């Protein structure tokens, strides 16, 4: 029961707390302001790079060995995901963060399962 309770708690955090908070901040606040200021192409790339940089900073705060592959994965995957979910929100979600939240929560769950197995 202890492991299942932990998995449930971690899953809820991945789905709601982390994904929702990051989507509200990065896509609901940062992306909207950068896109309004510099246009969709530049604003979306800028917010995606900031999103990727945050995830790289989180890696640097761990004791995981810092290989080039890890640096690239932890920077590039969130950067691409950040660009895609902002595009999804703006082009298909009428500006709502809900589509991005769903995509982000799914990515967090996949990562939550895959990273311990592959890292």
Q: Locations of the language-model features?
A:
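Interfacial loop-to-helix junctions that mark the boundaries of transmembrane helices
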Residues: 1-3
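Transmembrane helix-loop-helix hairpins at the membrane interface
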Residues: 5-119
């Amino acid at each position: 029961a202890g492991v299942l309770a932990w998995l449930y708690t971690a899953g809820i955090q991945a789905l709601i707390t982390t994904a929702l908070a990051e989507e509200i901040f990065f896509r609901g606040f940062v992306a909207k302001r950068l896109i309004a200021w510099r246009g969709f192409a530049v604003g979306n790339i800028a917010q995606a790079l900031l999103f990727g940089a945050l995830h790289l900073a989180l890696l640097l705060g761990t004791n995981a060995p810092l290989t080039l592959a890890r640096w690239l994965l932890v920077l590039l995957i969130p950067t691409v995901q950040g660009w895609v979910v902002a595009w999804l929100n703006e082009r298909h979600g009428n500006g709502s963060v809900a589509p991005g939240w769903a995509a982000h929560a799914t990515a967090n769950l996949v990562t939550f399962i895959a990273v311990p197995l592959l890292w």
